[in-house]
Amino acid sequence: MKHTAYIGLGANLGDRGECMRTALRRMAACVGISLERISSFYETPPWGNIDQPPFLNAAARISFCGTPHHLLKQLQSIEYALGRVRREHWGARTIDLDILHIEGVTTEDDMLTLPHPYLTQRAFVLVPLAEIAPALVLHGKTAAEWCSLSDCAGIVRAAELSGPYPLELIAAADEAGGIGRAGGLLMHCKEDMAHFRRQTMGGIVIMGRRTMESLPDKRPLAGRENIVLSSRLQGASGFCVVPNVPALWNLLGQLTLDASRRIFTIGGAECYRALLPYVHQAYVTRLPGIYGADTFLPPLKGFALTERRTGEHCIFEIYKRI
């Protein structure tokens, strides 16, 4: 039997955003757990013990099979794997995963109390919970009503990506999986170029240095935010340059703070490999023939082919993470 649960997430040590996204990815990988909805991440002041760094907080709705206590053990194992050490009540932590509420379930024992005993007292819990489940009834009031009664001072939406898999991948590969040769494209297929433009227009595109250098006149792609992931490149006109993945997350959080945008990794091979763990969907154009490539698309392990359409000169495929 499947149950619906609401999980609170928090962190105030280390790379808080990536730790929370990693926790969400690990939750999604647990047997019997499905992530259904995730709130924005929020900057929040510490609660209880105020002599500690500020927190990031969020809420997630999941479905799960099994007992509440088994779910608790799964969440605690994720906390442990991510370095959670329980030294101080209400103290600083790398990650905190709390079961806030399970629909249709109440329980109270030494291990677990549901609904969470402090649920309606904590604005840092209520704000993200009300975002994803405003009509959820808790002790006679909705989450939105409890939120309106709370002191939400100091709680603001964070410039952080909250999705565990926030990226999409788009590539064109020949029959051998090749994607490039001598720093450039294998071939120019107008049909694929139109597909690429249609998918990415208005979004954010992330590329490696060699891909940037292969663009016509090294100019950014029009109508898109262009980001180069490179530890060697100091700067390039019209491009945002980030030296590593943590810096990329910071920039993407800022670029998507006011409105969500599609985010694509567009190559080359090193960029694909670095960002594939964070991709939820891949668009792959299959080009007929083999063109002597020297760079190749990484295997899409953990993805399933969900759509295949034959074009005039190529085949368009969509893969989704499973």
Label every model-predicted segment:
Residues 2-9, 13-94, 103-105, 148, ...:
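Nucleotide and nucleotide-moiety/phosphate-recognizing core
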Residues 34-39, 127, 280, 304-306:
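A short, local hydrophobic-aromatic micro-motif
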Residues 103-167, 239, 295-322:
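Conserved histidine-centered catalytic loops in small-molecule metabolism enzymes
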Residues 21-23, 52-53, 108-110, 114-116, ...:
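Short, glycine/charged-enriched secondary-structure capping and boundary segments
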Residues 62, 101-102, 171, 321:
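Conserved hydrophobic "DFG−1" position in protein kinase catalytic cores
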Residues 165-322:
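Enzymes that bind and transform nitrogen-containing heteroaromatic metabolites
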Residues 32, 80-84, 134, 152-155, ...:
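Generic structural signal for secondary-structure transition and capping sites
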